[in-house]
Swiss-Prot record:
Belongs to the UPF0435 family. This is UPF0435 protein RBAM_008100. It comes from Bacillus velezensis (strain DSM 23117 / BGSC 10A6 / LMG 26770 / FZB42). Pfam families: DUF1128 (PF06569).
Length: 71
């Protein structure tokens, strides 16, 4: 995975983590995602960044989606 792409993925993961106030997302790294999952992660990032607040069930669903996107 190219360095620029790795930086972009790390930034998206960090953004999602901060937006959701998730403490355990720090263990997820760009290397945890295969190239074919990048589009899905980008979509998830865009969706999370558009919303201003999340219910507990939405936060749980997003965390589960992140986990499912890992290699």
């Amino acid at each position: 995975m190219p360095s620029q792409q790795t930086e972009t993925l790390n930034k998206m993961i960090e953004d999602i983590s901060q937006k959701l106030n998730m403490l355990n997302v720090g263990v997820i790294r760009a290397e945890d995602f295969s190239d074919e999952k990048i589009e899905d992660l980008t979509y998830l990032h865009q969706m999370v960044m558009k919303k201003t607040s999340f219910s507990p069930s939405e936060m749980q669903a997003i965390a589960e989606e992140l986990a499912s996107l890992r290699k």
